[in-house]
Amino acid sequence: MTLKRFSLFARNIHLPKKTNAASVESNGSLAPTDEELEVINSLPPFQHALQLSSQSATKAKRSYLETKLPKVQKLFKSSRDPAYLAYDFPQGLSNPYVDAHARPVTNPVTGDTKYRGTPRLSVTKLLTKRWCELRETYDIYSRIPIFEHSQVKQGRKEHQRLEEEVHAPPANIEEFEANFEVDIPDDPFHSLVEDWYLSIVRLVTLFQKGQAREILCHGYLSSRTSGFVRGKVKDDNDVLVSGIIDHLILRQRRAKNNVPSSLTQVLSESVDINLAQFLNLLPSLVQQASKDFEIVVSDVKTRSTKTIPRQQTVVKASKMQVMYYRFLLEDLGRDAETTYQKLLINAQRRGFNVDQPINPAKIINLLEIDPMIRGDMERLQRGDQLGFKPFDSEAELNTSQPVYTLEEFDEKITDLRTRQKYETLFTTWNTPVTLRYFAARLALMYENVGPLLSQNLMIEYYCGDVNFHNISFSFDAEELERQSFDSAQFWFGKRAIEPIKPNMKNLQTYCKYCDYESVCLWRKEGRQACKTLGQELVRLYNGNSPNAITRE
């Protein structure tokens, strides 16, 4: 268990019927040939770049750069200075989302669209100016994952530690999964099932214990308007944007600290949660608590030293990231029926059939992780309604589903403990368990989060296991709208690349940490301009000085 400038719709992007198909071969438009790689590698700046990297980088990083730099050089080779990388989009490839990220291919006969890339964006992908947008562009078009250095690996461990402090895995879950007598699927479809279920469980923990970690959120960005979609998703050209929220804190509004607080004492003392009963009770509790409690959205940043980043673009991007999370969570919390639809489209955009029955072994596995949906499973077994209209209506209409049965478990499972807990479920069910069920329950959980969302946001900085500094700030809807529009304009090829301002401070601060430092034409021209400006200022100063006049 683990825990240019063409509009997008002009490229005939549709809801994918198939995704990431191995049978689709790349046309090679972005991939250099062996001969091209040899020529590129022989260019003096590239030899210099690789020599520099060999002095300070690890063997893994050197290998990484030797693969990435030639690919970028092939696409961005400057016509004015061929040894350097240009700072505009490659000719005919000016839509980063279509040309480098999603890379759709439409079958001219069937009209089916397949993707050689990823037909969605993440919140972090929207932060194109967190460092330098030109560097981001080169990385996007290289189609090579960002190098994972030791600090990133350490940060992931720290996130996992924080997650398990709040959401400790059941003590015997690994043993159960290893010894269960039926194979438990762990393919992408069933991984999504588990992810949605864990988000449900963790949001219950939020109201019970006052905090939750690693919560899914998502929304849709219009490739036509470059704005986020409000309400139902109606356009196949609306691009899925997903994120994972590091930390949600339920606290008293007038509190001077971030101490988590249960919504009510009754919830904090509850041990065995029945999800259906919990959801029936929760709306009234949220309404009563809305004046006194708030949910703060926070992001965790790990650092190798007890310092915060000096670069203002980095801090600003971190704030924007949390604002995105808060915005998406608020949107999901407006109306459960609309959110239900958005969740189903989310799954479809990933290539999944929302009516595909979930493997019964996975259901038993989820019940072992947390049994709060046991009552719901028994309702589906009997064919009873859940009490959520969109789901119940679809269940009544969908009569062509295959038989959903756990009868074979009666023969396969001999473990007495497992049989004692679950054998009443080993029958044929009237309603199959599909992604629709988890979408319905997760949508209702989001709806109860929305009313409590705070305008106060936070970034938590950790060094090791020490939370050494927090930055508190306010949600700014107008700024978020400006930034998201600007980012969408970039991703959908509706504006030019906007590198860092080429002043000496930026060129020294940002460029020295960049993989493209020695082959970047923007940096080269910026340094030349700064040098020329300095010489001109000296000339002007000397020309206007009294001593200069006397000499003349």
UniProtKB/Swiss-Prot annotation:
The keyword Iron-sulfur applies. One of its GO terms (molecular function) is metal ion binding. Binds 1 [4Fe-4S] cluster. GO terms for cellular component: mitochondrion; nucleus. Single strand DNA specific 5'exonuclease involved in mitochondrial DNA replication and recombination. Releases dinucleotides as main products of catalysis. Has the capacity to slide across 5'double-stranded DNA or 5'RNA sequences and resumes cutting two nucleotides downstream of the double-stranded-to-single-stranded junction or RNA-to-DNA junction, respectively. Monomer. This is Exonuclease V, mitochondrial. It comes from Lachancea thermotolerans (strain ATCC 56472 / CBS 6340 / NRRL Y-8284) (Yeast).
